[in-house]
Amino acid sequence: ANVFKAKANIKARRIWLVFSLLLTANYGTDAANGIYPKSSYIIFVALCWIPFFIGELFFRIKGKATDAYRLCLVIGYGIFYTFVICTTDSPISFTYILPVMSLLVLYKNKKFMINCGIANVLSVIVSDVYRYVVLGCRSDADMKNYQLQVACLLLCYICYVMSIRHLNESDGALNGSIKAD
């Protein structure tokens, strides 16, 4: 079991690293071109990389199979993600969570995935309320985007939970057939 936890953590770390590199480069280019203030980019970089390196410390101190890593990933990336969706103009920024969250299926923990889904949807709702109230993004297109963001995330998490349920059932059936032999 620890071998599979370690493999899941390593795969999650790789995706977190790749996505952090991509977003850092993308937002760095935008900041250099004046799209975002440099002060926002500094906050962006800190929120992106500090949690990643804290996760690295967990790996070194507690080992690659530690359950603490997935919590570090979810909390650290979640804070970073919430900052991004509140500060970017892109209506598709809510999807930046999907590559990382889709890997959480590897942990095959339905309750954990449901809790992540609730937290993710709440962060998008907070962002949408912020954009509506503070930034004044109230057009019909904005309202449609808000609805589609929440609906898309809910459907993704429903599919993630269904996938986990299926994986757990198939593992149980496989284990049962092995025991029967």
What are these regions (language model features)?
Residues C86-P91, K108-K111:
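Transmembrane helix interruption/hinge and helix-loop junction motifs
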